[in-house]
A protein has these predicted regions:
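Short coil turns that delineate tetratricopeptide repeat
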Residues: 59-60, 93, 127, 161, ...
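Structural signature of tandem alpha-helical TPR/SEL1-like repeats
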Residues: 41-50, 75-87, 109-121, 142-155, ...
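Alpha-helical segment of the N-proximal tetratricopeptide repeat
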Residues: 20-80, 97, 101-111, 138, ...
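Terminal, low-structured helical/coil segments at or just beyond the last alpha-helical repeat
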Residues: 1-14, 18, 252-253, 260-297
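Helix-start (N-cap) detector for alpha-helical repeat units in TPR-like alpha-solenoids
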Residues: 27, 62-64, 96-97, 112, ...
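Position-specific recognition of the canonical hydrophobic site in helix A of tetratricopeptide repeat
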Residues: 38-40, 73, 100, 107, ...
């Protein structure tokens, strides 16, 4: 048999080469089809995943695996995306950027222990990485560890004074824990740096309400409403402030706005008040606000 193959110019080596060329061609087609699909439209992510998975079945390739991780992220498969980044990190254990992407996917997948472990590793490699400190804090917060989270946010700010996300999270955490003055400092810093930030104005409104400054809180909620006319939090919490100030009509108007934007926001309440008398509406509004703690304290 070997003699006949030799006679007709066919050898085992030639057959192996032809097979390799064929599989290499298939790999490139699958890889390029997947990349093209991702670039064209996020709606093609499912097809791209299939292309990349088939390509990896032919040959392990770091570029294809990273593209697979991106496609899985676009599909909302965060845990699977983190798994793919994890395999890339195994190849480059000191690549802080890859570890960060893995940690970000793990955070989206609610895998907070993975997040904190990955961020700790990043800080070993890059002690001055403020973004890693911020994500580290988010991981702590996900596990309910508020004090370490605040410490890590403070470190993030110390490393980068322009890390406004760290100021926002720290202010929110301080307010949650009852450190209103500390929260106020962060909120005022945020509003000074980013006056058009809805979240910054909302934090300052909540701080003022916690301090009992109803009028100022109401003004800040007005600002949030100007920035985002569909902010359920702004209308709901401003309504609570108005009710505390004795403005039942104003509170009722804000409640109507809440129910118009998000009819299912309040359990046992519908957006249709037309069948009720005015006293019934006010009663419902008051009861609704009694069930709401807008400051989360």
């Amino acid at each position: 048999m070997g003699f006949l193959k030799s006679l007709f110019g066919v050898t085992d080596d030639n057959a192996a080469d032809e097979k390799k060329q064929s599989t290499d061609k298939d790999f490139e087609i699958l890889k390029n089809d997947g990349i093209r699909a991702l670039r064209q439209c996020q709606c093609n992510a499912d097809y791209a995943v299939k292309c990349f998975e088939h390509a990896l079945a032919i040959k392990d390739d770091a570029e294809v695996r990273e593209q697979l991780a991106v496609a899985l992220y676009q599909l909302g498969e965060y845990a699977q995306s983190a798994e793919q980044y994890g395999k890339l990190v195994e190849l480059e254990p000191d690549n802080a950027a890859l570890i960060m992407r893995k940690a970000e996917m793990a955070y989206l997948a609610d895998e907070y222990d993975v997040v904190t472990a990955d961020c700790a590793r990043i800080l070993e490699l890059q002690p001055d990485n403020s973004r890693a400190c911020l994500l580290y804090a988010r991981g702590y917060m996900g596990n309910g560890n508020d004090i370490p989270a605040i410490a890590m946010l403070t470190k993030a700010i110390a490393l980068d004074a322009d890390n406004l996300d760290a100021y926002l999270l720290r202010g929110q955490q301080l307010l949650k824990l009852g450190d209103i003055n500390g929260a106020k400092e962060d909120a005022e810093k945020l509003v000074a740096e980013a006056p058009d930030s809805e979240e910054a104005q909302l934090l300052l409104a909540r701080v003022n309400e916690a301090l009992g400054n109803h009028e100022e809180a109401s003004n800040k909620y007005n600002k949030v409403g100007d920035l985002n006319p569909f902010s359920v939090e702004a209308f709901r919490e401003r309504g609570a402030v108005k009710l505390a100030m004795g403005d039942k009509e104003g509170a009722e108007a804000d409640m109507r706005q809440v129910l118009e934007i998000a009819p299912d926001t309040l359990d046992g309440t519908t957006g249709d008040f037309t069948a009720e008398g005015r006293e019934g509406i006010q009663c419902k509004v008051e009861q609704a606000y009694k069930n709401i703690n807008p400051l989360g304290l």
